Amino acid sequence: MKQDSRFPNLFILDHPLIQHKLTHMRDKDTSTRTFRELLREITLLMGYEITRNLPITTKRVETPLVEIDAPVIAGKKLAIVPVLRAGVGMSDGLLDLIPSARVGHIGVYRADDHRPVEYLVRLPDLEDRIFILCDPMVATGYSAVHAVDVLKRRNVPAANIMFVALVAAPEGVQVFQDAHPDVKLFVASLDSHLNEHAYIVPGLGDAGDRLFGTKN
């Protein structure tokens, strides 16, 4: 895991397996089925990295030989909240890692001015819960900012929110940092820039279309 000095709340997950799978996802000739499988796999690997600092306590358990105080996650409950629609493809990988997590959904689409328009919010109970927001792309950053806004408006502490994406553009990361400097943003790659259509370059195309086999 590494950081970029420009963005204090950005964490780049540079594990070799993550980078290997991301390269195959970028390939325009990768099939929908393979893209979907890779997204699930890479999200599981990223989930392992982002949860390494969860608080730990101990629980008394009895093994076949003795009783011991064994480590368990302390108190906090976990929720996975994909940003629709492409974020849905990331939730399965996280659920493979954390099968007991609750799942919410935040639905937004990008208007002509690239601003997010909310059409759905469904969340589990908020008390004492850590939220993992996920969306494959942070392009303009507006949808990511909006998703965090949804939680903060419901009094979820910033310390209980993290955002996970595959690729991000510096422009979007700056927007996210300006709005939510207290929320950690985890990505597999910080790419070069946004083009005139607000697509990430080099990016991986439209993640939703590639995930579901649709055309924009």
Swiss-Prot record:
One of its GO terms (molecular function) is uracil phosphoribosyltransferase activity. Its EC number is 2.4.2.9. Keywords: Allosteric enzyme, Glycosyltransferase, GTP-binding, Magnesium, Nucleotide-binding, Transferase. The gene is upp. Its cofactor is Mg(2+). Binds 1 Mg(2+) ion per subunit. The magnesium is bound as Mg-PRPP. It is an enzyme of class 2 (transferase). Disulfide bonds: none annotated. It comes from the Bacteria. Uracil binds at I200, G205, D206, A207. Belongs to the UPRTase family. CDD domains: PRTases_typeI. NCBIfam families: PRK00129.1, upp. One of its GO terms (biological process) is UMP salvage. This is Uracil phosphoribosyltransferase. 5-phospho-alpha-D-ribose 1-diphosphate binds at R85, R110, D135, P136, M137, V138, A139, T140, G141, Y142, S143, D206. The keyword Glycoprotein does not apply. It catalyses: UMP + diphosphate = 5-phospho-alpha-D-ribose 1-diphosphate + uracil. Allosterically activated by GTP. Pathway: Pyrimidine metabolism; UMP biosynthesis via salvage pathway; UMP from uracil: step 1/1. The keyword Cell division does not apply.
